[in-house]
Amino acid sequence: GKTKASEFASLERIEFRLAPLPLLWQTIRIPQIKLTQPRADLLRLADGRANWDFDLPASDSDEPSAWQLDIREIGFDKGSVSLDDQRLKTRLEVLVDPLGKPVPFGQLAGKALATGDAADAQDYVFGWKVKGTYKGQALAGSGKVGGMLALQDASKPFPLQAEVSAGSTRAAVVGTLTDPLNLGALDLRLKLSGTSMANLYPLTGITLPDTPAYSTDGHLLARLKEEGGALFRYENFNGKVGASDLHGSLTFVARQPRPKLSGKLTSEQLRFADLGPLIGADSNAEKQKRGQTSRQPGDKVLPVEEFRTERWRDMDADVEFTGKRIVHSDQLPISDLYTHLVLNDGLLRLEPLRFGVAGGKLESDIRLDGGKQPMQSRVKMSARGFKLKQLFPGFAPMQTSFGELNGDASLSGSGNSVAKILGGADGELKMLINDGAISKGLTEIAGLNVGNYLVTKLFGDDEVKINCAAADFGLQKGLMTSRLFVFDTENALVNVDGTVNFANEKLDLDVTPHSKGLRIFSLRSPLYVRGTFAKPDAGVHAGPLVARGAGMIALGVTVGPAASLLALVAPSKSDDNQCTALLQRMRLPAKVPAGKR
């Protein structure tokens, strides 16, 4: 490959004016330099050696020269720059040509930037084009710049305009650079778009999540010489991510030891499906669109796409996000969303992640430690006050119900994907539902084929009132085991017993009905649910079962789980909640049958 450039730089002609008076105080002041057909060939090797580094001869004196060089403005005509940076895997060719006629700055900048300090910006005099690769990604672009570069005079902003594509990312900027000799400040209108925000990482080093296709339009201000590190502020931007709108302001500080991104974002109307890529829960077609190489196996439900934890230690973050209105189907009655995301040295915290659901709240604290391999996860969730009539708005029998769903869940696990985390997790799940109803029609609304089969076998075509449904599951190494799972209906007490295996996504559940009172319950044989999450299968057991674990619900041996579930009954509603009576009965010790004492 290329190891050195034949010439570092060349000029056809150079013209300059020298101010004679400052020579009296040992200052070489050049008010203006004009360069004719400048060309630079820049080369940096993989070992860091660069042809723009010069070994100057050692001075006989350690004292600095008393003379000072003061260049005020520099102008140029048609020129070119080539860059071959083997360390950054970047090869670029830049061509600069004079425009036929200067273009006024305000004509391209618009009203927002053509006011204030930027109003003094020069006209655009040159057009430029760039082509090549940047950090291994194809890059192409074009734009316009001014003719006289005001090197020191901040009152003469230098105009910039560019449209650049790099990989799947597109950027358009128009604005000014001030005090360029000291890389002083940028004032730009910036439009960004691409197939996923995560694709900005190799270009900018900013760690952003996987998203659907996005576009933003906002005001970028940069102060490049801040003491704490260069500061970039993308303020009052508006955009779209998938079918959701996005607004806000973000600040990025290139501080040490890690840069930090902070800000507040809002979405007036958030499509819930647009959150799918955050955990790899979008379709394979959508993964391909955003440039993700992993694919979800057809026989797996839990997302296998891995979090990019190797990026999490490259940047810190403190960002608040509010989704004011959630767009979803009737099966997902989520109304709003709020989260406070903090990323610090690879530890990602969502504290809280809060959803409004069916008139209640789903609140969770999530800690994902990406600084460890595999990633260590801890999740705590609580569901409070989910109104059943809002959970199932299309199910008429539930519309007169005052019932609620309440629950708690916690888990800890390790792994770099949702599937890996759940496949080896420890934790528990507790849930109570009171004053509900169920029928074949409800399972059809929810799209549950297996549920449809079970309800039909248990209750026929009738709508059945559920006094209480109570569930307590333990989770150990990815295997969730029923400690208590019971439906108390007007006709029967239905016990569900068995396991759900998150490691292999297999179901092994038995459903056993017990008739109540003098009513004769028609089903004699228990049911089963087998198969996988993707293809569950239900059927009727050939004969009676030997009770396992919590299978002795009807005999009242679930003292511990019943007592812990009582905590989910709201104190103000305990008298009306039919779960209270059921769980109180289950707390009593089992009675030993007569004759077996």
Q: What is the role of each PLM region?
A:
Residues 555-564:
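Short, glycine/alanine-rich hydrophobic alpha-helices that insert into or span membranes
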Residues 59-61, 113-115, 279-310:
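Intrinsically disordered, low-complexity segments enriched in small/polar residues
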Residues 590-592:
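Short cysteine/histidine-rich zinc-coordinating motifs and their immediately flanking basic loops
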Residues 14:
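An amphipathic, basic-hydrophobic helix/alpha-beta surface used to engage anionic
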Residues 1-10, 29-53, 73-75, 80-82, ...:
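Small-residue helix/turn framework positions
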Residues 18-24, 306, 412-418:
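Outer-membrane beta-barrel proteins
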